[in-house]
Amino acid sequence: MNSDILYLENADYSDFLVDLSFLKIERPVGVTGLLRVKNDAEFIELCISSCIDALDELIVTYQKSDDNAPEVIEKMRKKYPHKIKVYFYEPSILSHNLSKEELDFVKTMPENSVHLLSNYYNYSLSKVSYKYVVKIDTDQVYFSEKLKGICDLYRSSYTQKITFKERLVSNIALYLDHCYNVLPLMGSLFFSNVIMGYYESYIKKMIVNKKVMLSVSGVNLFFDKNGWEIPLGNNANGIRSPFNGVGDTLFFEISKDTYYTPWECYDKRRNRYFYLEKFYKKEQTVLQGGFLWFHLDAIRKNKYLDNKSLYNGNTIKVADFLKKKNIVNVNRILFMKSFRFYYNVSSTNLE
């Protein structure tokens, strides 16, 4: 059993209990980033620097750390005092790498327990000052211009006419997106070149007009003697796939129907359990926004030396990955399962 939870069982954590009535508060137009931190000092400054200009506000909540993450957070808060707000989340959380006994224990806790990861996420959400929100992760470096462009769409107050062709092509794109298991050999070049220009225009206008939710993803990076490369694994073999966070990051408007609930999952490979968070959003339209960041997990200091040998021969140069003639050489099944997030990667500066 996790001793941290038992040891702090009788502590006064009333300040960390979350009343979901905060979801009904009217907020001014703007975009808030939510950054939750535990360790990760090596990436915090780079992450914040890449996203802060695009955001109206960055809420940083952090837990007890084993490195100097709190000091780095304070450094960045002082650098951007008009945008960054920092909160320390004191309760310990039981969520990752759980035994069956620990999982059974944590599932007995009430859904709003301060020791659940979902409550930690809701606590962070409760500190938001603006109407629109996006999750920010410490080990991600954002495509700053694209992020600002998306935030500007949510901040926009005017409407734009959606053309018949844009609407038609968007329906075709969504249909093809649902067919990737049926048509695994469908050419991504057609999808990217012919359809995606109209689809991207449609997405932008839908955000401006309807403030729909937008789902975004990232690109995993690795670094070796040849420079920056993209891994070609499948995660199950210990090597990252080319894509990161496929669909797990949303831009959304805070409402009574947007909050976090507990979510249980099991890692068969390691025989460990996880009691994480799941974003509840009722039934709302979600459009795909393509790539928005580089994911740096594979080059963490505590992983890099082991990964150098593991990743050897299982990467592709960033420039080659973006060349149309080489895209077809990427694992087709892996690629097609994620190709709906690929369409506008070439518009970002990945090299």
Q: Where in the sequence are the language-model features?
A:
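Active-site-proximal specificity loops/subdomain of glycosyltransferases
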Residues: 10-28, 68-132
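Short, acidic, metal-binding catalytic loop of nucleotide-sugar glycosyltransferases
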Residues: 49-61, 65, 75-76
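A short acidic, amphipathic alpha-helical/loop segment
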Residues: 46-50, 72, 149-150
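N-proximal low-complexity "stem/linker" segments adjacent to membrane-targeting elements
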Residues: 1-50
